[in-house]
């Protein structure tokens, strides 16, 4: 069975077929770096990291691009709050600070680096060129103050992504009217300069690009058009992604410049949508100072990506315990592989977990079911495989371990499994010495070594004459 994913553009779960076989080109809208990254951001980027890992496991090359909107009203306002009259000179410090935090938190969440992280400020010339083309084609117009607006009414089927009609949007007063606009729904491609704000030159006036244009220009610059998938949070469907489609349709003549539109649901805290206005925003720094990145990844995985996720620290406690179980299974099986025999005396029934894991991901990326199967396999390893390892061939044991690691790698939840080689050699030597002491019935000294190892995070598990160890990662 092939990969199947929900496409917001068609409102259907569709088979994922890329334009170029085994090459998946994707763009995910990045942060506007004016404040701390929060767990809502984390959910989006962890999902697309898992999706990427899964595609790579299926043999795809994945080219992923994530942008930074490093100039925006929110950044300017933040700079004014912090620097006052010096904001014009020091505004760049704001995005630099929070972009650095984004990368720091991404590392702690074991998110694989994207292939490019374009910034708006590095692509202004390309954006000016796009606007000039749109004006020439008659899809954009220059307002009296030099701002340039996209004329929504010139594009057929505007609202196709969000399934809304222009008349209904106007009647619902979804967009604030501005001087110089022909239509309240028209949006800025170029914003005229306001004294005290950063600006760039253009044929119309000093100013800066509009948000919706920025993502179209950067995505197609790095991926071409059309490309395979475009993603972000569900809150971006309208107006941001809707307006991107309109711009690309006018520029390229394409009905859709991305084949699949993939959106991640929002987070709730105590039943309310997480937002600054409600004061219930939880930052990634706060969470990752108390919990492992793998626990947060697993907590995200326990909710289907398209559904709202109720976030709680109780959920993280549960996820952290599950991560410990996953590591225990990995560590104990890794140690036990060496003791397996050379021939099968008994079959190990582990295939159902693997089949169900991949079947879940093939069906609109159901990570709750996939996580359940991975955890089920971990428990099976601990309760069954280790106690019957002498009856299974070494190759069977290796196969179990290999498949287990592949599954965990897709969800990104065994990322700290490697122990430094020097440390591992010392641990093995002490474990072997303790085993000799036990054989010679020098139990008091053997117990002393067990206690000393426990003090550095190494737990010993005795199965008859065999001893395995697990390493508690810090």
Curated annotation (Swiss-Prot):
<feature type="binding site">
    <location>
        <position position="244"/>
    </location>
    <ligand>
        <name>Zn(2+)</name>
    </ligand>
</feature>
<feature type="binding site">
    <location>
        <position position="215"/>
    </location>
    <ligand>
        <name>Zn(2+)</name>
    </ligand>
</feature>
<keyword id="KW-0067">ATP-binding</keyword>
<dbReference type="GO" id="GO:0006423">
    <property type="term" value="P:cysteinyl-tRNA aminoacylation"/>
</dbReference>
<dbReference type="InterPro" id="IPR032678">
    <property type="entry name" value="tRNA-synt_1_cat_dom"/>
</dbReference>
<protein>
    <recommendedName>
        <fullName>Cysteine--tRNA ligase</fullName>
        <ecNumber>6.1.1.16</ecNumber>
    </recommendedName>
</protein>
<keyword id="KW-0862">Zinc</keyword>
<comment type="similarity">
    <text>Belongs to the class-I aminoacyl-tRNA synthetase family.</text>
</comment>
<keyword id="KW-0963">Cytoplasm</keyword>
<dbReference type="GO" id="GO:0008270">
    <property type="term" value="F:zinc ion binding"/>
</dbReference>
<feature type="binding site">
    <location>
        <position position="240"/>
    </location>
    <ligand>
        <name>Zn(2+)</name>
    </ligand>
</feature>
<keyword id="KW-0547">Nucleotide-binding</keyword>
<keyword id="KW-0479">Metal-binding</keyword>
<dbReference type="InterPro" id="IPR024909">
    <property type="entry name" value="Cys-tRNA/MSH_ligase"/>
</dbReference>
<feature type="short sequence motif" description="'KMSKS' region">
    <location>
        <begin position="273"/>
        <end position="277"/>
    </location>
</feature>
<feature type="binding site">
    <location>
        <position position="29"/>
    </location>
    <ligand>
        <name>Zn(2+)</name>
    </ligand>
</feature>
<dbReference type="InterPro" id="IPR015803">
    <property type="entry name" value="Cys-tRNA-ligase"/>
</dbReference>
<dbReference type="Pfam" id="PF09190">
    <property type="entry name" value="DALR_2"/>
</dbReference>
<dbReference type="GO" id="GO:0004817">
    <property type="term" value="F:cysteine-tRNA ligase activity"/>
</dbReference>
<dbReference type="InterPro" id="IPR014729">
    <property type="entry name" value="Rossmann-like_a/b/a_fold"/>
</dbReference>
<keyword id="KW-0436">Ligase</keyword>
<dbReference type="Pfam" id="PF01406">
    <property type="entry name" value="tRNA-synt_1e"/>
</dbReference>
<keyword id="KW-0648">Protein biosynthesis</keyword>
<feature type="binding site">
    <location>
        <position position="276"/>
    </location>
    <ligand>
        <name>ATP</name>
    </ligand>
</feature>
<dbReference type="GO" id="GO:0005524">
    <property type="term" value="F:ATP binding"/>
</dbReference>
<dbReference type="InterPro" id="IPR009080">
    <property type="entry name" value="tRNAsynth_Ia_anticodon-bd"/>
</dbReference>
<feature type="short sequence motif" description="'HIGH' region">
    <location>
        <begin position="31"/>
        <end position="41"/>
    </location>
</feature>
<dbReference type="GO" id="GO:0005737">
    <property type="term" value="C:cytoplasm"/>
</dbReference>
<keyword id="KW-0030">Aminoacyl-tRNA synthetase</keyword>
<dbReference type="InterPro" id="IPR015273">
    <property type="entry name" value="Cys-tRNA-synt_Ia_DALR"/>
</dbReference>
């Amino acid at each position: 069975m092939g990969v199947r994913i929900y496409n917001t553009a068609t409102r259907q779960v569709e088979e994922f077929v890329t334009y170029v076989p085994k090459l998946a080109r994707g763009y995910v809208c990045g942060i506007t770096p004016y404040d701390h990254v929060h767990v809502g951001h984390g959910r989006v980027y962890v999902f697309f990291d898992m999706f990427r890992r899964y595609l790579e496991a299926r043999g795809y090359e994945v080219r992923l691009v994530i942008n930074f909107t490093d100039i925006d009203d929110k950044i300017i306002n933040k700079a004014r709050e912090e620097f006052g009259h010096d904001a014009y000179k020091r505004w760049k410090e704001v995005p630099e600070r929070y972009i650095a935090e984004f990368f720091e938190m991404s590392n702690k969440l074991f998110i694989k680096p994207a292939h490019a992280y374009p910034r708006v400020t590095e692509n202004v010339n390309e954006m000016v060129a796009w606007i000039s083309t749109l004006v020439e084609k008659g899809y954009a117009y220059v307002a009296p103050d030099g701002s340039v607006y996209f004329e929504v009414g010139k594009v057929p089927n505007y609202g196709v992504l969000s399934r809304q009609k222009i008349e209904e949007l106007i009647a619902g007063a979804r967009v604030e009217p501005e001087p110089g606009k022909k239509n309240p729904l028209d949006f800025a491609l170029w914003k005229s300069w306001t004294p005290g704000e950063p600006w760039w030159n253009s044929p119309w006036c000093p100013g800066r690009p509009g948000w919706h244009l920025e993502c179209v220009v950067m995505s197609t610059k790095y991926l071409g058009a059309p490309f395979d998938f475009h993603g972000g949070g569900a809150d971006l469907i309208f107006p941001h992604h809707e307006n991107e489609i309109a711009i690309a349709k006018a520029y390229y003549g394409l009905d859709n410049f991305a084949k699949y539109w993939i959106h991640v649901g929002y987070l709730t805290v105590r039943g309310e949508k997480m937002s600054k206005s409600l004061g219930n925003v939880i930052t990634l720094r706060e969470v990752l100072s108390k919990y492992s990145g793998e626990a947060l990844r697993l907590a995200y995985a326990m909710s289907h990506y398209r559904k709202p996720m109720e976030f709680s620290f109780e959920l993280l406690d549960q996820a952290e315990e599950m991560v410990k179980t996953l590591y225990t299974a990995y560590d104990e099986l890794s140690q036990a592989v060496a003791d397996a025999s050379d021939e099968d005396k008994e079959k190990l029934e582990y295939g159902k977990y693997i089949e169900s894991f991949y079947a879940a991901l093939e069906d609109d990326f159901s990570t709750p079911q996939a996580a359940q199967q991975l955890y089920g396999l971990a428990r099976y390893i601990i309760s069954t495989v280790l106690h019957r390892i002498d009856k299974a061939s070494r190759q069977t044991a290796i196969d179990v371990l290999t498949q287990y690691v592949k599954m965990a790698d897709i969800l990104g939840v065994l990322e700290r499994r490697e122990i430094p080689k020097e440390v591992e050699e010392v641990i093995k030597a002490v474990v072997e010495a303790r085993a000799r002491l036990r054989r010679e019935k020098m139990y008091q000294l053997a117990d002393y070594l067990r206690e000393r190892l426990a003090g550095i995070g190494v737990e010993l598990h005795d199965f008859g004459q065999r001893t395995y160890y697990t390493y508690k990662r810090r």
